[in-house]
From Swiss-Prot:
One GO process term, biological-process aspect: phosphocreatine biosynthetic process
Residues bound to ATP: 17-21, 81, 115, 166-170, 197-202
Gene Ontology CC: extracellular space
Phosphagen kinase C-terminal domain span: 14-244
Pfam families xref list: ATP-gua_Ptrans
Swiss-Prot/TrEMBL keywords: ATP-binding, Kinase, Nucleotide-binding, Transferase
Protein name as catalogued: Protein-arginine kinase
A GO molecular-function descriptor: ATP binding
CDD domains in the cross-refs: bacterial_phosphagen_kinase (cd07930)
EC annotation from Swiss-Prot or TrEMBL: 2.7.14.1
Organism whose genome encodes this protein: Clostridium novyi (strain NT)
Gene3D superfamilies per record: Glutamine synthetase/guanido kinase, catalytic domain
Amino acid sequence: MENWINVNNASEDIVLSSRIRLARNLKGIPFPNKLTVDSAKDVVEKVENAIFTIPDLKDNLKSNHLWENDNETNKMYLEKHLISRGLIKHAKGSAFLIDNDETISIMINEEDHLRLQTITSGLNFKEVFKSINELDDLLEENLEYAFHEKLGYITACPTNLGTGLRASAMVHLPALTANKDIVKILNGITQLGMTIRGLYGEGSKAYGNLYQISNQITLGRAEEQIITSLEGIVKQIIQQERLARERMKTKYKYEVEDKIFRSLGVLKSARILTAREVLNLLSNVRLGVEEGIISNIDKSILNNLLINTQSASIKKSSQKKLTDIEEKIERAKIVKEGLKGIEL
């Protein structure tokens, strides 16, 4: 699979990435929130020992213990969508493993003992599901999962019971956000057992017009059914976004183009930038790239700036403590360097 951050596929507009997570627990062991720190570390060791005996995994996965990392390192992995807020919350006894391409992540002791994750670029649930299914099968041969004949996989949260599968697509919806139709969509898909959240999932806001669309219910539905249903809804939203963009360009052609190029100019010239400013300005430029208004910027550049200008990533790359203003100055420098050589 391709790392979504570094991909530059002209056909992949609107949908930045597809992700699937599986929640799994080990038989006979209390859920992570009931474990002592020492017991949680025992679970980490148990899982790692099992993984590193699997030939197909041991040479391609690197382990990270959150209790050995500084807080900024852990937050940096969150910003790259490789781990969750829940994992950081349990940092004293949690860990994760990632592959060399950063498309596979295995979180240990989040809400459940295991959260398996695969992520790739574009709307590509078929490939993502194939990858995570193979990973799950390999682990289940070496670890005994908590499973109930009627309920399916046992999870800490009842909404994950059954398949334990959560699929999500990260989508860029500037037109639907601008015309307020995103509110209608949110209300509509909630009734279909789906949800829309911000860039970093539950509890986060949709800065930069970036949303995560995911399923809410896993019990009583097959994996393929969940994925097919979600993919169908995402495709409908894509179509609505495209129609909204066409109407916007027809009615406000020069205003749209002005906003796009003005945003690019600010990104290239600003000396101080907040994280929210960058997300919103990048959204305008991304719209220009996706609509062919700007032709000399790769989407991979925008994706990397999206990640590298987040707070923890800046602090980690600078390798020193930064004041609020220093962070904003550093962010502007990163953006300027990322867009170096690109003409207005």
